[in-house]
Amino acid sequence: MKTMNYIKIGIASSILSIAAGCTSFLEEDLKSSLAPDNTYTSSLGFEVGATGLYAIARSEYNTWGENGAFMHNGACAYEVLQISTDLCRMGTVRDGSLVPFAEMTLNPSTLFVGSYWNWAYNLIASANELLIYSEKNDNWDYPTDKQLYQAEARFFRAYAYRTLVYLYGDVPWVETIQKPFLLSFSRDPKIEVQGNIIKDLEFAKTYLPDNPDNVKEGKLTTWAARHLLSEMYLLRGAEGDYKLAEENAQDVIDCPYYSLMKSRFGNAK
């Protein structure tokens, strides 16, 4: 009988010890997958996040849907913005994705409308996430890393909103991570969104590097931000904006790292 009691006590003790360890056992310790909480903890993690922004931005030109691109069987923004103007016209081979823009028959069911909206807000959400976590992190390789990655993120957020205001006019300006998930956004006036775009680009202009030889190939420099700033000041057209557009454009023209093309290239040179 005593033996049976000892067994029961042993079983009960085991159950209690298992129950006590359940909490720690169930805590997630991610070792083989990336999430913001275990990625944005160092300069290397922010480099990973910034690389993702470049990938999303470049997917804009993957117009035929390869590898899960956001654009599906459609034209890029530059084509649709020009096709109904005197800059270009559709050839004898009619691109179905351009027809609604060329003939002014665009409607909410046009695939391009949803795909470009999704592309832009995916880039914006990813940039916002990097920016928010950069304010929480204090583990940087160099004191300038925080502002550098913030500059890249703010450039891409501005770039996405630039496309949105061209295509849709008034759009929701979002700079937070929505928790809980939110669908009921309100559109902000285009003039306000343009002001926010300019603020982002002014920040990027200040903290992006100026020498392209000191960054990895394809990485942003201050000159990209200045080029886009010139365009955005022209687009907004408020008092003093044309002068600022000229100044930023002149900075790019005069910079020692780039030059205007002065001769033809290829077979027609």
Regions found by a protein language model. Give the residues of each.
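Membrane-proximal, proline-rich intrinsically disordered regions
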Residues: 22-74, 263, 268
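Bacterial Sec-dependent N-terminal signal peptides
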Residues: 1-31
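Conserved, well-structured interaction surfaces
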Residues: 47, 55-65, 89-168, 184, ...
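Short, surface-exposed recognition loops and adjoining beta-strand edges that mediate ligand/DNA contacts
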Residues: 37, 63-88, 208-224, 234-269
